[in-house]
Amino acid sequence: MAANILVIHGPNLNLLGRREPAVYGQTTLEDINRNLTVKAQAAPVALSIFQSNAEHELIDRVQGAMSDGTDFIIINPAALTHTSIALRDALAATSLPFVEIHLSNVYARESFRRTSYFSDIAVGVISGLGAAGYELALQFALTR
C-alpha cells in the first residue's frame, strides 16, 4: 500500500464548481480535497494536495516528490495534458507510479483534448467520472 500519496491539480481546477459546471460538475476543488482527506485519514495514509495554475510550480512539486517520501501520485494535469512535455518529463524522472485523472470524458469533447502527453507513462487513466475519479484513483493507490 502506498503510504504517502500526492494529489496534484493543474490549471483552472481552482475554479471547479463555477467554471463550466455542465462539463466539470458542481463539486468544488475544496469538496474534492476534503473528501480525499477524510478517506486518506481512514486508510490511514499521508496525503499531500497541491494545486497551481503555473506549469513551473507543478514541475517543481513533482520533482520534490522524488525526495519527500511520496509513493504514488494522482494528477489531473488539466489543459497541460495536451501541451506540457516538461511536466511529462518531470513525472517520468521521478519513476513514481501515477494515475492521470480527468473530470470530463476527454474523448467526448474537442479533438485536441484526446491527446495526452501522460497516458502512456501512467499506470492508469480515469476520465469522465467526475469527482468520483479522484476517489477511485485513491482507492487504487491504496492497493499498490
UniProtKB/Swiss-Prot annotation:
UniProt xrefs under Pfam families: DHquinase_II
EC code(s) of this entry: 4.2.1.10
Annotated positions for site Transition state stabilizer: 19
CDD domains the record matches: DHQase_II
GO molecular function, one term: 3-dehydroquinate dehydratase activity
Listed pathway(s): Metabolic intermediate biosynthesis; chorismate biosynthesis; chorismate from D-erythrose 4-phosphate and phosphoenolpyruvate: step 3/7
Keywords, comma-separated and alphabetical: Amino-acid biosynthesis, Aromatic amino acid biosynthesis, Lyase
InterPro entries, sorted: DHquinase_II, DHquinase_II_CS, DHquinase_II_sf
Record-annotated active site: 24, 102
Binding site for substrate: 76, 82, 89, 103-104, 113
Catalytic activity entry: 3-dehydroquinate = 3-dehydroshikimate + H2O
Swiss-Prot/TrEMBL GO biological process terms: amino acid biosynthetic process; aromatic amino acid family biosynthetic process; chorismate biosynthetic process; quinate catabolic process
Functional description taken from the UniProt entry: Catalyzes a trans-dehydration via an enolate intermediate.
Family statement drawn from the similarity comment of this UniProt entry: Belongs to the type-II 3-dehydroquinase family.
Oligomeric form and interacting partners: Homododecamer.
Name recorded for this polypeptide: 3-dehydroquinate dehydratase
The organism of origin for this protein: Nitrosomonas europaea (strain ATCC 19718 / CIP 103999 / KCTC 2705 / NBRC 14298)
